[in-house]
């Protein structure tokens, strides 16, 4: 993927994770969030976004050790396909519409953070527990 996506610390040996930044998306109109949301439509849970904070537009990928080489290769192919699509330069709107195939589309993350709607009901205590 190093020929399509940008590695902020160069191509060094890594153990179990890989970190990309968003410079490969420069001038495409596609944001880190847009790219991650498009992953959902491809059947993958998005990678960790915007962390670590010292990397602009960070995309942190940590596959589990139980994934087969074939599964990792397929994941890489999806990432490569999305990166190529973003670099076409005329696909920003396609990315901004993602995810398309989920029960809920894009949520208003700002409103959710500022005005959370949380539900929790304590379990009723039995009489024995009160004694």
Segments the model singles out, each with a brief description of its role:
Residues 2-131:
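Non-catalytic terminal extensions of PLP-dependent enzymes
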């Amino acid at each position: 993927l190093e020929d399509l996506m940008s590695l902020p610390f160069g191509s060094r040996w890594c153990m179990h994770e890989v970190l990309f930044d968003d410079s490969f998306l420069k001038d495409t109109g596609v944001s880190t969030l847009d790219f991650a949301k498009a992953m959902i439509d491809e059947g993958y849970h998005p990678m960790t976004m915007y962390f670590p904070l010292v990397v602009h537009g960070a995309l942190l990928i940590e596959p589990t050790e139980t994934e087969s080489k074939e599964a990792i290769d397929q994941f890489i192919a999806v990432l490569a396909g999305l990166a190529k699509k973003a670099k076409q330069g005329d696909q920003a709107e396609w990315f901004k519409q993602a995810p398309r195939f989920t029960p809920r589309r894009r949520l208003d993350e700002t409103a959710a953070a500022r005005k959370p709607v949380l539900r929790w009901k304590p379990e009723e205590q039995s009489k024995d527990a009160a004694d």
